[in-house]
Amino acid sequence: MKLMGLDVGSRTVGVAISDAFGWTAQGVEIIRINEDAEEFGIDRVAELVEELDAGGFVLGLPKNMNNTLGPRAEAAQHYGELLTARFHLPVDFEDERLTTVEAERMLVEEANTSRKKRKKVIDKLAASLILQNYLDRHGKLTQE
């Protein structure tokens, strides 16, 4: 079963997909959203679920460094509730502390990417890292 990884922010959602075996994750795209206007990009997610044959979701859960949940983690959980209501597919969460920092480091140090280009791909790369970390630990969706 392919899993869709999502890095949910206040303005964008980075999207990644696993291979059918649950071994690797690759970035797909970045969906523009507007939390304030309650535009969450769910219709585009629906198109991608169908197009990519996703059977479940893994969302990044941005915990605080002391392991507590703050406003961004609550927003991610709310997004998970929206996905569950719309798709009736399993949703699980992966601790995403520092994944965006890691993505930024990879783009600067390893790919020597310009700041303008980084802004265009960082959320997609973060979604890939979140999903890959999940796959490396679990190999499959644990919340079925």
From Swiss-Prot:
Q: Which InterPro entries match?
A: RNaseH-like_sf, YqgF, YqgF/RNaseH-like_dom, YqgF/RNaseH-like_dom_sf
Gene3D superfamilies in the record, alphabetically?
YqgF/RNase H-like domain
Q: Which GO terms describe its biological process?
A: rRNA 5'-end processing
Function according to Swiss-Prot or TrEMBL: Could be a nuclease involved in processing of the 5'-end of pre-16S rRNA.
The family database entries (Pfam families) matched by this protein are listed as: RuvX
The entry lists its GO molecular-function terms as: nuclease activity
Main location as per UniProt: cytoplasm
The record's subcellular locations are: Cytoplasm
Superkingdom of source? Bacteria
Q: Which family does it belong to?
A: Belongs to the YqgF nuclease family.
The record's EC number reads: 3.1.-.-
The organism's lineage is: Bacteria, Bacillati, Bacillota, Bacilli, Lactobacillales
SUPFAM superfamilies (UniProt xref): Ribonuclease H-like
Q: What is this protein called?
A: Putative pre-16S rRNA nuclease
State a GO cellular component annotated for this protein: cytosol
| Keywords per UniProt | Cytoplasm, Hydrolase, Nuclease, Ribosome biogenesis
Coiled coil as a keyword of this entry, yes or no, is no
